[in-house]
Amino acid sequence: MAYPMQLGFQDATSPIMEELLHFHDHTLMIVFLISSLVLYIISLMLTTKLTHTSTMDAQEVETIWTILPAIILIMIALPSLRILYMMDEINNPSLTVKTMGHQWYWSYEYTDYEDLSFDSYMIPTSELKPGELRLLEVDNRVVLPMEMTVRMLISSEDVLPSWAVPSLGLKTDAIPGRLNQTTLMSTRPGLFYGQCSEICGSNHSFMPIVLELVPLKYFEKWSASML
């Protein structure tokens, strides 16, 4: 999860987020190299007194600055498209959870179980226990098995929120009348916090998301206790 004065991303806990972090570093290196080259050329232009007053065109230079940007764009586009297809790919999910956005809370339904559903409200600041996080804790956490593919079906009843958990690389809009889907898989257990990431109304800031990823045997015990 995030911590005060954090400068980078949250620690990745899913294969998709790992890929996104690698892509970010890859793109940032390209931006750094281009910026360094531009600054170097500007410094040369400001410091040198040599000019080519008789030069009308330079086909070699024009060819280079046409081909080089195209190569750079391809180097950015190919890994980006690969990650986009990975995020859309859903292969035999082990569990399906339906998420509905409301004013101003989330409700969850485990569709593989006959009667396992609940609402998840933010815990008010006045009711927080020592060590709990302001504006991030909920009364009912979403418990999921780790190291298993989970499909999330996301929609809304009224407003237009967005269901997002940064450390898992998830952000999916919840739209009334439309069912969006995404997948998640955690490589380690823990609590993972998210929030509504679309300004959906007056209490947009009070729609936190808490996922509790646990080993399968603990998930089975939890699901049995909830039925």
UniProtKB/Swiss-Prot annotation:
E.C. number: 7.1.1.9
Binding residues for Mg(2+): E198
Essential cofactor(s): Cu cation
Mitochondrial matrix side: 46-59
Annotated compartments: Mitochondrion inner membrane
Keywords, ordered alphabetically: Copper, Electron transport, Magnesium, Membrane, Metal-binding, Mitochondrion, Mitochondrion inner membrane, Phosphoprotein, Respiratory chain, Translocase, Transmembrane, Transmembrane helix, Transport
Record GO biological process: ATP synthesis coupled electron transport
Membrane association type: Multi-pass membrane protein
Catalytic activity: 4 Fe(II)-[cytochrome c] + O2 + 8 H(+)(in) = 4 Fe(III)-[cytochrome c] + 2 H2O + 4 H(+)(out)
InterPro entries referenced in this protein's UniProt entry, alphabetically: CcO_II (IPR045187), CcO_II-like_C (IPR002429), CcO_II_C (IPR034210), Cupredoxin (IPR008972), Cyt_c_oxidase_su2 (IPR014222), Cyt_c_oxidase_su2_TM_dom (IPR011759), Cyt_c_oxidase_su2_TM_sf (IPR036257)
Binding residue positions for Cu cation A1: C196, C200, M207
Subunit record text: Component of the cytochrome c oxidase (complex IV, CIV), a multisubunit enzyme composed of 14 subunits. The complex is composed of a catalytic core of 3 subunits MT-CO1, MT-CO2 and MT-CO3, encoded in the mitochondrial DNA, and 11 supernumerary subunits COX4I, COX5A, COX5B, COX6A, COX6B, COX6C, COX7A, COX7B, COX7C, COX8 and NDUFA4, which are encoded in the nuclear genome.
Family: Belongs to the cytochrome c oxidase subunit 2 family.
Annotated protein name in UniProt: Cytochrome c oxidase subunit 2
Source organism per UniProt: Ovis aries (Sheep)
